[in-house]
Design a protein with these regions (language model features):
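Short alpha-helical "recognition helix" segments of helix-turn-helix
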Residues: 16-23, 49
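Recognition helix of helix-turn-helix/homeodomain-like DNA-binding domains
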Residues: 24-41, 65-68
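N-terminal alpha-helical segment
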Residues: 27, 42-45, 80-84
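Key DNA-contact positions within bacterial/archaeal DNA-binding proteins
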Residues: 18, 29-32, 58
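Short, charged recognition helix plus adjacent turn
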Residues: 61-97, 101, 115-117
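Short, basic-rich loop-to-helix N-cap that marks the start of a DNA-contacting helix
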Residues: 38-52
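A short, Lys/Arg-rich alpha-helix, primarily the initiator
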Residues: 1-18, 96-120
């Protein structure tokens, strides 16, 4: 099994880290820490990266697995977190990768936004 950095590099194609971080609404330092494995990625960051990289559902599962997580494992999530993740999964499954539009929807429905730049 590949680690996060290998999996991320496979999916980022020709994009720079700065571009991916901006599209994922993440600080560049956050992405750098995740890549160096000095900071384990949380689900929020992985979802944001999946959106920014325009991953399919299977590719998103691969990204989660590279971090030792399961995309569909919701046993430790609250009902609100499960509902939020279902909205995100729906966007990915339907190829809707506009993070701003998704964050507006999450905000309007009272959920935490994706990314860590200017989010709650």
């Amino acid at each position: 099994m590949k680690n996060f950095k290998e999996t991320y590099e496979k999916f980022k194609k020709n994009q720079t880290d700065a571009t991916v971080a901006a599209k994922a609404n993440l600080y560049k330092a956050t992405l750098s820490r995740i890549k160096k494995e000095t900071s384990p990625p949380n689900r929020n960051y992985l979802w944001a990266l999946a959106m920014a990289l325009e991953l399919s559902v299977d590719e998103t599962e691969e990204l989660f697995a590279a971090c030792g997580l399961c995309m569909d494992s919701q046993y430790h999530l609250t009902d609100l977190e499960k509902e939020r993740e279902n909205i995100i999964k729906e966007c990915i499954a339907n190829g809707k990768y506009n993070l701003l539009e998704l964050n507006i929807r999450l905000y309007e429905e009272g959920y935490r936004l994706l990314g860590n730049k200017g989010t709650n």
